[in-house]
C-alpha cells in the first residue's frame, strides 16, 4: 500500500432520528493505546510476508473466532488480518504501559491533594493540583498520539498496516460492545432483536435506556 493511500478510520453509526429521554453513554477507555498493548502491535513484532497476512475484516471477526493456528504460534491477529508475535512485549506496548502507569500514579496523587485541599485550601496546593492535572493530560495526549504517528508517512516508524490494524480492531471492539449491549437489553426486556444503541462514534456508544426505565419503574411512583 502506498504512503498516501487512505485507510479506514473509526466507526460512526448513523444516529437514530428523534428525541430520546433516557440516554446512557459508554466509553471504551483509551481504546487505541489499549489495542496496541492487547495485540502487541509494534514494527518489530509485525509478522511480514504474504502467507502470514490474510485480510479478514471486521464483519468476519464479528461472526467468527480466530483460528487455532495463530494461537499455537503465539500470534495475535488484528481485524485487518495483520499478525503480531507475542513472544516478547513490543517497544510500543512497553512505552504505552509505562506512560499509563505513570499517569495512574499522578492521578492518584492529584486526587489525594484535592481531598487535602478541601480542608486546607491553600494557593500552594492549588498550584500543585493544576501542575498534576496538566501533566496527566499531557501524558493522555501522548498515549493517543502514538496511533496517529504510526499512520504518518513522515514518522520514522511509519507502518500503514499497523495503523489500519488499530482502527479496524477499534471498529471490531465497538461493534462487539454494541452486540453485547443489545443482547443484554433484549434478554432483560424479553424483546425480539431490537436495537437499543442509538449512536456510536469510534470508542463510544449511546444507549436508549427508556424501555428499561419504563419496565423497572413502579406502577404508582411517589
Where do the protein language model's features map onto the residues?
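Conserved acidic
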Residues: 1-222
Amino acid at each position: 500500500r502506498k504512503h498516501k493511500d487512505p485507510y479506514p478510520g473509526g466507526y460512526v453509526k448513523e444516529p437514530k432520528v428523534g428525541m430520546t429521554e433516557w440516554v446512557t453513554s459508554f466509553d471504551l477507555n483509551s481504546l487505541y493505546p489499549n489495542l496496541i498493548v492487547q495485540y502487541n502491535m509494534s514494527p518489530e513484532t509485525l509478522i511480514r510476508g504474504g502467507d502470514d497476512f490474510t485480510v479478514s475484516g471486521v464483519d468476519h471477526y464479528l461472526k467468527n473466532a480466530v483460528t487455532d493456528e495463530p494461537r499455537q504460534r503465539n500470534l495475535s491477529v488484528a481485524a485487518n488480518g495483520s499478525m503480531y508475535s507475542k513472544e516478547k512485549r513490543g517497544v510500543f506496548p512497553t512505552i504505552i504501559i509505562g506512560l499509563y502507569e505513570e499517569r495512574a500514579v499522578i492521578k492518584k496523587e492529584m486526587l489525594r491533594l484535592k481531598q487535602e485541599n478541601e480542608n486546607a485550601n491553600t494557593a500552594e496546593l492549588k498550584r500543585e493540583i493544576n501542575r498534576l492535572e496538566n501533566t496527566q493530560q499531557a501524558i493522555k495526549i501522548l498515549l493517543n498520539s502514538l496511533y496517529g504517528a504510526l499512520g504518518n508517512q513522515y514518522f520514522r516508524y511509519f507502518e500503514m498496516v499497523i495503523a489500519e490494524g488499530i482502527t479496524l480492531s477499534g471498529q471490531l471492539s465497538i461493534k462487539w460492545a454494541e452486540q453485547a449491549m443489545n443482547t443484554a437489553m433484549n434478554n432483560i426486556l424479553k424483546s425480539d432483536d431490537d436495537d437499543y444503541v442509538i449512536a456510536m462514534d469510534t470508542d463510544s456508544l449511546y444507549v436508549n435506556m427508556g424501555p428499561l426505565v419504563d419496565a423497572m419503574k413502579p406502577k404508582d411512583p411517589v
